[in-house]
Amino acid sequence: MAEPRKSGLISHGIAAQNRKARFNYTIKDTVEAGIVLRGAEVKSLRMGRATLSEAFAGERDGEMYLFNMYIPEYQGGVLSRFDTKGPRKLLLKRKQIDQLLGAIARQGSTVVPLDVHFNPRGLAKVTLGIAEGRKQHDKRQAIAKRDWERDKARILKNR
């Protein structure tokens, strides 16, 4: 019996992750949103080539959009040209939009994407975090705590 072919494409699971967001911000709440993508964007995203490091969510005409999310052009398609950093509409219910807009209105809060993933049905979803910026000393404390946890686990393992 032949083995199934491994294509390297992501059918479900995390396609891109914003690792800096959890370090630079304190995440207060998370919301999962759908995202409007064209065919070539989905194919490029399934290859795991998106970047969320500079991305943020904002409001335009009463709707939520994701700005500065980089999805490179899909190499397999000739006619599929799209703006690699263009705004992408987020699919949210009105109550969720109002919650996010209220968070943006508060001073010091922003909405950042934490990851882009495909759900079991194969639909692209974005996990948004309502975040507040961390001060430099908070970042240092987080690093010290993480290092201590790592050292503690190493010590307990070697007992």
UniProtKB/Swiss-Prot annotation:
Pfam families: SmpB. Keywords: Cytoplasm, RNA-binding. The keyword Cytoplasm applies. It is found in: Cytoplasm. GO terms for biological process: trans-translation. The keyword Repeat does not apply. One of its GO terms (molecular function) is RNA binding. One of its GO terms (cellular component) is cytosol. Its main location: cytoplasm. Belongs to the SmpB family. Required for rescue of stalled ribosomes mediated by trans-translation. Binds to transfer-messenger RNA (tmRNA), required for stable association of tmRNA with ribosomes. tmRNA and SmpB together mimic tRNA shape, replacing the anticodon stem-loop with SmpB. tmRNA is encoded by the ssrA gene; the 2 termini fold to resemble tRNA(Ala) and it encodes a 'tag peptide', a short internal open reading frame. During trans-translation Ala-aminoacylated tmRNA acts like a tRNA, entering the A-site of stalled ribosomes, displacing the stalled mRNA. This is SsrA-binding protein. It comes from Acidiphilium cryptum (strain JF-5). The lineage of its organism: Bacteria, Pseudomonadati, Pseudomonadota, Alphaproteobacteria, Acetobacterales.
